[in-house]
C-alpha cells in the first residue's frame, strides 16, 4: 500500500472506514509483527504481541466479553458483558481512541474510533447478534 501511494490516499479521503481484526490493527501507526511493520497511521498507537501467561493460549481464539470505555453510535446495543469472537496473536493497548476493551492476558482495545475511522478487533461475522449489531450501527452511522 505504501509503494502504490494508497496510504496517502487513505489518509486524505473522507470516506468512513471500518477495519476488522487485522484491518483494525492496520489502522494504527506500527505493528511489532515481523520485527516491526509500518501500518497506515490513521490512528495513533502500536500493535503489540499478546504476552504469554499461565493458562493463556496464543493465538487467542474464542469468546470474550466487551467493556465500554466511552459511548459511541458504533457500540449502541453492545453493553458491558456482550460476548464477541476473537482470533488474534497481536493486540492494541488501550488508547484515547478506544471505545470498548476486552481482557486476555491484559486489557486490550476491542473497538476503536478516531473521526470517521472505526475498528473492531473481534470478528463481527462470527459474533452472532453482537456482530450484526456492530455492522448495522456502522451502516446507520455512515448512511446519508
Model-derived regions: residue spans:
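Phosphate/oxyanion-binding loops and surfaces in catalytic or ligand/nucleic-acid-binding neighborhoods
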Residues: 46, 50, 69, 141
Amino acid at each position: 500500500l505504501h509503494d502504490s501511494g494508497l496510504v496517502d490516499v487513505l489518509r486524505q479521503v473522507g470516506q468512513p472506514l471500518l477495519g476488522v481484526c487485522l484491518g483494525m490493527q492496520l489502522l494504527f501507526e506500527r505493528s511489532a509483527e515481523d520485527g516491526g511493520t509500518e501500518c497506515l497511521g490513521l490512528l495513533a498507537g502500536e500493535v503489540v504481541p499478546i504476552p504469554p501467561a499461565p493458562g493463556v493460549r496464543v493465538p487467542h481464539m474464542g469468546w470474550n466479553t466487551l467493556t465500554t470505555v466511552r459511548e459511541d453510535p458504533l457500540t449502541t446495543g453492545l453493553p458491558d458483558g456482550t460476548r464477541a469472537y476473537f482470533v488474534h496473536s497481536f493486540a492494541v493497548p488501550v488508547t484515547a481512541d478506544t471505545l470498548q476493551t476486552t481482557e486476555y492476558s491484559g486489557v486490550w482495545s476491542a473497538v476503536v474510533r478516531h473521526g470517521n475511522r472505526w475498528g473492531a478487533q473481534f470478528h463481527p461475522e462470527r459474533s452472532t447478534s453482537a456482530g450484526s449489531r456492530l455492522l448495522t450501527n456502522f451502516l446507520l452511522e455512515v448512511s446519508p
